[in-house]
């Protein structure tokens, strides 16, 4: 658990995989885009290393890279990409917001996870990113600033995730979109019975109803 927000340290240059050729990456990327036109090769941050700073926080060293190096892992092409993302646990009146991933997404289709979440973009502060993701995915605003509580590694998708505790007044469930096909607000006992949680959600589960 974090006692202070993580610090991102940007390393100059651009991450390019060494273990595979760019021709292999381009061919795999073209195959993915043919299957799902929603794929977009945007800028991402590659994690070079994560270390504790001795003050209840962590330093995350990052370098700019491209999303295609992450995406092609779905076809078994490991570029060594390790992106950094943000995840939020939204609490509203003693319940937390979860969503079921649609079949159109690249990772965890059909699995339940905490909403919101997304990949951190270069130049964007992590707390601003999680607020943006919440606005995009739930079309709602936060009622208090995000609080960073943990940094996790999602082994299923090889990504580092900064986890935030979020507060919002969720009076009605968000409308579904292309990323999620169902939303729920669940109490602790209900969350325990939810099957098909994503790997990252299972790691976040003990944090969900812990004391803030």
Task: Describe each region flagged by the PLM.
Residues 174-206:
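NUDIX/MutT-family hydrolases
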Residues 132-133, 189:
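Structural detector for helix-capping/boundary residues
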């Amino acid at each position: 658990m974090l006692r202070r927000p993580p610090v991102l340290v940007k390393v100059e240059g651009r991450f390019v995989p060494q273990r595979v050729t760019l021709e292999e990456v381009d061919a795999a990327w073209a195959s993915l885009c043919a299957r799902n036109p929603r794929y977009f090769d945007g800028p991402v941050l590659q994690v070079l290393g994560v270390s504790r700073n001795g003050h209840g926080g962590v330093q995350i060293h990052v370098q700019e890279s491209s999303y295609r190096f992450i995406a092609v892992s779905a076809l078994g092409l490991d570029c060594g990409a390790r992106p950094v993302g943000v995840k939020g646990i939204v609490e509203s009146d003693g319940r937390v917001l979860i969503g079921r991933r649609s079949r159109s997404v690249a990772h965890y289709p059909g699995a339940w996870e905490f909403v919101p979440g997304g990949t951190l973009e270069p130049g964007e502060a992590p707390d601003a990113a999680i607020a943006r993701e919440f606005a995009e995915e739930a079309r709602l605003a936060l009622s208090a600033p995000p609080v960073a509580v943990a940094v996790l590694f999602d082994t299923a998708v090889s990504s580092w995730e900064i986890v935030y505790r979020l507060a919002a007044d969720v009076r009605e469930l968000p409308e579904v979109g292309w990323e999620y096909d169902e939303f729920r607000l669940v109490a602790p006992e209900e969350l325990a019975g939810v099957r098909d949680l994503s790997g990252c959600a299972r790691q976040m589960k003990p944090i969900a109803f812990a004391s803030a």
